[in-house]
Amino acid sequence: VTRPASIADGYAADDIRAAEAPLLAAGAQLMRVAAAGLARVCRAEAPEGAVLVLVGTGNNGGDALLAAAELAREGRAVRVIRTASRIHEDGAAEAADAGVRVTASDDLDDDAVAALGRASALVVDGILGIGTTASPALRGEARRVVAALLPVVAADHGPRVVACDIPSGVGCDDGAVPDPTVLPADVTVTFGAGKAGLLRGPGRALAGRVALVDVGLDLSGATPLVLADA
């Protein structure tokens, strides 16, 4: 008996992007739906306390910035560390309007990054997403920030970690981890459909629990790389 495909299965990043394209062309607010789902999981993982959001370039960072804005509007103390010179403009503007302080990572030394982590109940990893086409390994400022936070999240009573779509540093399709400088997530909030890299390879252990936010993708023409219950 052929098992029907499920959006919880692990799909290739190219198939996800292809399924997103017609919705984006039609003006669908995929990022807002994704951000609302991310914020919902953040509340569940850390109902109170400060939130530290790590933001890189691209739409992954945009999702994280919009979620940061939503949490800040609810009265949460939210701080953003920007690891890239350019971040999602609309997301950054909305976060700033909500009172979120955005700091460039190169304005913070390792001790300052670690101190922000220790002061937080939750760290959100929004550095890299499925748009990464080269090696998933973190580099430069992103790698330095994550390295500074690793002992913080590993400590007793350290902050919870929520990854946005896929933990930064994990290969989207193969789950490869070419550099161990990866924040291990307690929960990965993935959008549209499961990513194969969350279900296989070293990435599986780093993803934690996978929470799927359905944004209405049509994946009927795509074949999963990994079955969720395999």
Label each residue range with its predicted role:
Residues 36-129, 133-164:
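Nucleotide and nucleotide-moiety/phosphate-recognizing core
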Residues 1-17, 23, 120-230:
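YjeF_N-associated NAD(P)HX repair module
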